[in-house]
Amino acid sequence: MTLTDCQLLSIVAQLGTFAAAAERMHITPSAVSHAVSGVEAECGFPLFTRTKSGVTLTAAAEKLMPAIQQMLASSESLDQSIAQINGMHKGALRLGVFNSACVTWLPKIVPGFRAEFPGIDVQIYQGSYDDITGWLKTGAVELGFLSNSSAQELDFEPLYDDRLICIAPPDYKPRRPGVVRAEELRGQPFVSQQSDVDADIQSYFKKNDLHVSSQCYIVDDQSMIAMVACGQGLALMPELMFKEGAASAGCQVLQLEPAAKRSIGLAGLSRGALSPAAKEFVKHAREFARMR
């Protein structure tokens, strides 16, 4: 299997259709289909399950993907190292990011990074903690913004401690102004996110033996804030997201007792094996976090 074959299979697996892969690679869908069939013949087994809506990896192909992604990453790192020796910075950096980091950090980090290294193509993939962890393990992304609670099996560099807060409707009355104790949350209606999105919140509930009742299950932070503001319940969320995106959202902001925080950072499979582009991005993110 050649490097070009690996690139083709990775793109098809990522995009899910031959047509989308063809557009990305500037070739025809029939050329993609023919190339994939050729690789399948070489391997001796199918790599994709074909349906009317697209293609998905077979179980056998899923076993190959980590090695394929490792080959692509090694090739990319080699190209970047050669360029660096020649006094240039070029290549691609694939970055996984969760919602609040995408909203609050990337707009302040990426433009400066691109200005300093215009030859590096920064590719951003937004997803949940579980998505990013999976992408890192398969090599789909090289770096990922994560919290410490979701990066236990990865090489994680903490950058910023972000407090968790409780947001409440305007008419909610805590026992002590500005503060809500964990036991006060029992029996209250909650606006919640999916468990793979709010792992830090779920950890707080578990540590404080809280079994909350939720009627609203929300995907993104801004929708959660809107639901709380209109009286649908309380919510726990990172302070960073509220400060940056919802200062006038009409919610009360309450400090938690006991207090809790999440540690935001960058994760990868191995810090020592990062490409030159990834190492430079880590430096930029580290400096940005230090100045906050």
Residues covered by each model-derived region:
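A short LG(V/I)-centered, amphipathic sequence patch enriched
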Residues: 40-57
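Alpha-helical linker/hinge and terminal dimerization helices associated
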Residues: 42-43, 64-86
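Short helix-boundary/capping micro-motifs
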Residues: 11-28
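A late-sequence structural motif
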Residues: 105, 252-292
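Hydrophobic hinge/microswitch elements
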Residues: 128-133, 137-140, 147, 196-252
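Central regulatory/effector-binding core of bacterial HTH transcription factors
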Residues: 90-152, 218
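Flexible hinge/capping segments at coil-to-helix
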Residues: 153-190
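Secondary-structure junction motif
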Residues: 174, 188-209, 274-278, 282, ...
